[in-house]
Structures are given as C-alpha cells and as structure tokens.
Amino acid sequence: MRITAVDDKKNLFEVRDLIPMDILEAVNKIDLDQVPYDKMGWLEFSSRKALQPLDGSAMAELQNYIKTLHNVLSDSLGFKVHTIESTFWLDSHNFIFPAHIDNPGIESAMQIYLNDCPNTGTIFYQVEPEEIEDKDDSQKWHYTGTIPPRSIRHEFAFEKNNGYIMINNRTQLHGMNGKLNASQRRFSLYCWIN
C-alpha cells in the first residue's frame, strides 16, 4: 500500500494497492448488473449508479476493510481520521463528469478504482484563487476560469487498485475529460473521510 502526495501542497495524494488482492478479486467476480442500486439524483450523473452491496458480499467485506484504515490514513495525511464512510459507484454509457469543486461539506474524499477504464481517470487542475467565486448556495465554490482549465495538476489513471485522496478546499477543481462510450464502465469505491 502506498499513499504519496502528488506535490508539496500535501492536499492531494495518489493511492496505490490499498485493497488486498483477495478482496479485490472477489469484488470483481460479482455481476454488477445484478447488484441493487440507487440512481444518482443529479441530471449530470444520470449514468451513475450507487450500488448497494448485499450483506456478507465481497463488496460489504471491502467496505468493512476500508473502515479499519483510520490509523493508516491518519499517519499518511497528517490529521486524525475519525470516520470513513463509503459507497460504490458504477458509471456507464454517456456518463460525464465536468470539472467542478466539491462543496465544503466534503472535508476529504478518497476514490479507489476497482476496474481498468483507460483515459477516464479523475483530472485535478491547477487554478488560482481569483478564478473561484463564492456563492450563497449549496455548492458554495464555483470555478469561473476557462473550460477546460489550461493547467493540469495531476491526472490519475483509472486502473484497478489505484486512486486518490483529496483534502477539499476551494481550489480542488477536478473532473473527467469526455464522455463514456457504450463499451466503457467505471467501477469505484468512493469514501468520505472525516
């Protein structure tokens, strides 16, 4: 397992080999089309399903394992991790993920990719504070610069057992280029870290 800061800001980390191979292999044997799910409520995420793992399944085992990583994450991130909650996302045909900044309600987040889906990983951009507008809405932070942003801070490859941890702030602009085609599916574990 490796958790490495992508630069000297130490608020964005690459995560590699976090999940034990036996759990990862068991998760990838599951027929994802048979797993219960909730559709995401936002229009831009209409091609995203939040999978609901069955009790006792390999997916539930993975969620339980992730909850045991408080000390590992605390040591790597430099702050005390109290809770790790997670959900499984399955993105399919026509999924888009435009550049955005998470709202301040998300303190820190981790996304671990569970399959390979080339050229669809999350891209974090280098933006200046003056390109961010604060609004009195649920999103709060809004990027006002050029689309797509000119400067890439780091691009994470959508590869099995790879991903990132983001400590949220008003300049953590991120998204995915393009749109998934009919043969592409992104399967990941998304975690809220507090």
Locations of regions flagged by a protein language model:
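Non-heme Fe(II)/2-oxoglutarate
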Residues: M1-L77
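Catalytic core of non-heme Fe(II) oxygenases with the double-stranded beta-helix
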Residues: F79-N194
